[in-house]
UniProtKB/Swiss-Prot annotation:
Primary localisation category: cytoplasm
Organism lineage string: Eukaryota, Metazoa, Chordata, Craniata, Vertebrata
Name of the molecule in the record: Large ribosomal subunit protein eL21
Subunit structure: Component of the large ribosomal subunit.
GO cellular component: cytoplasm; cytosol; cytosolic large ribosomal subunit; endoplasmic reticulum; postsynapse; ribosome; synapse
Keywords: Cytoplasm, Endoplasmic reticulum, Ribonucleoprotein, Ribosomal protein
Disulfide-bonded cysteines: none
Subcellular location: Cytoplasm, Cytosol; Cytoplasm; Endoplasmic reticulum
Biological-process GO terms, alphabetical: cytoplasmic translation
Function noted in UniProt: Component of the large ribosomal subunit. The ribosome is a large ribonucleoprotein complex responsible for the synthesis of proteins in the cell.
Single GO MF descriptor: structural constituent of ribosome
The keyword Transferase is annotated on this UniProt entry: no
Biased composition range(s): Basic and acidic residues: 112-123, 136-145
Amino acid sequence: MTNTKGKRRGTRYMFSRPFRKHGVVPLATYMRIYKKGDIVDIKGMGTVQKGMPHKCYHGKTGRVYNVTQHAVGIIVNKQVKGKILAKRINVRIEHIKHSKSRDSFLKRVKENDQKKKEAKEKGTWVQLKRQPAPPREAHFVRTNGKEPELLEPIPYEFMA
């Protein structure tokens, strides 16, 4: 049997609602404010068929470039064969949510500003870049009176 060519082909689980989350969409979904430049995650909601994004955009993150009464315009990167295209799509607000991907960065910016301010008052230099985790400190291992056992690999024997 051949594959059908429908818009919602293969979305049985993708657009289904979670367990005990069927029915009316919570009002908090409509109360969220979206502005130009916001970073949003696209996640299709099966209860609302209007303004639903195509399945290829499900789970993607984009930037808002246009806001209307019920929907927003989003710029999303989409891979088409060998190239990545910046696609502009219009999606209703039920199918998007603010992305948390930028929160950690903004938090770090605030912390760095605070560190800079304190360092300027003290007249000292402060490290602002994130550093990789250093190697663990040296420590002694307790043997409780037992001798350490030396482990050696078994020598290879060719059997033919």
